[in-house]
UniProtKB/Swiss-Prot annotation:
Protein name: Anti-RecBCD protein 2
Primary role: Modulates the activity of the host recBCD nuclease. And thus protects linear double-stranded DNA from exonuclease degradation.
UniProt xrefs under InterPro entries: Phage_P22_anti-RecBCD_p2
Gene that encodes the chain: abc2
């Protein structure tokens, strides 16, 4: 006889409801959702704009937290020593890395 699946006795996964109870609960929630008034296009766009503004604000806060505002310590690339610019590698080939 095979062993039961992992988590089969987990109370969070065992609903303990019969099929009719599950269907009654679904029917009640479905009726509740269908009884809500239909949202107009303007209301939906307004809600979306608010959600988008909140999302952008959260993103700005996150970016500030991981990259605080700093002033650059230098604005130009550091000059490379001319002696290191042309490095002669094996067999006399010039290597610039």
């Amino acid at each position: 006889m095979p062993a039961p699946l992992y988590g089969a006795d987990d109370p969070r996964r065992c609903s303990g409801n019969s099929v009719s109870e599950v269907l009654d609960k679904f029917r009640k929630n479905y009726d509740l959702i269908m009884s809500l008034p239909q949202e107009t296009k303007e209301e939906k766009e307004f809600r979306h704009c608010i959600w988008l503004a909140e999302k952008e604000e959260r993103e700005r806060i996150y970016q500030t937290a991981i990259r605080p505002f700093r002033k650059a310590t230098y604005t130009k690339f550091i000059e490379i020593d001319p002696r290191l610019r042309d490095y002669r590698s094996r067999y006399g080939a010039i290597s610039n890395n």
